[in-house]
Amino acid sequence: ELLQPGDIIIDGGNSRYTDDARHAAELEPKGIHFMDCGVSGGVWGIDRGYALMVGGSQGDFESARPIFEALKPEGDSGLVLAGPVGGGHFAKMVHNGIEYGMMQAFGEGFATMVKSDLVEDPAAVMSSWRDGSVVQSWLLDLLAIAFKSDPTLKSMPPVANESGEAKWMIEAALELGVPTPATAAALYARQTSRGGADDILRVVSTMRAQFGGHVTKIDEIATH
């Protein structure tokens, strides 16, 4: 074996928090310590630093602190011991659920302005929110970068994948009795974008046609 008693394994992937306690329990008889670390920052983290949410004991956290300090952004924020083993991945799961909701809200706002005759340049409006607005954020900064090369975003396919964390958050929230309608709506929107609702909507359209004669024709769907 390559590991020795006293060594620490840090899981820095987007792993499910429910697996962390099991991993720690499997390693404990061998004297090997386990920590989980939620990591945020995407491809920009290599230059900006990564936000790190750690789960584990205080002692292990202090032992591994030099590693975390080397990866985090400069300054006082960007690194937190979220709780015991599992806490880091749980915090990152919630972080990603919030991210889903924020991106969905920006998308809905953009689409509403595109459909309106009153806003001539939705991309310019959203880009202007980067300074002084209560909705300014790094996500909006990234969107503004994309707007510079494609103000309509027509080059981007209207499909959004999901990696699982929002679903896990909704499941955890249900167990805890916490309502998460915004996160759920954002997750369902992504699933719908991949055609997951096609058969559902065919059933709905069929029933409308049967009970009320409401026939939906593709070429009659309003576009703008």
Question: What positions do the PLM features span?
Answer:
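Rossmann-like NAD(P)H-binding beta-loop-alpha module
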Residues: 53-70
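Rossmann-like NAD(P)(H) cofactor-binding subdomain of soluble oxidoreductases
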Residues: 1-51
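Acidic-glycine-rich active-site phosphate/pyrophosphate-binding loop
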Residues: 28-29, 33-35, 69-84
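ATP-dependent carboxylate/acyl-activation modules
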Residues: 69-73, 209, 213-224
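Structural/interface elements that position substrates and couple domains in central-metabolism enzymes
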Residues: 15-18, 70, 74-77, 112
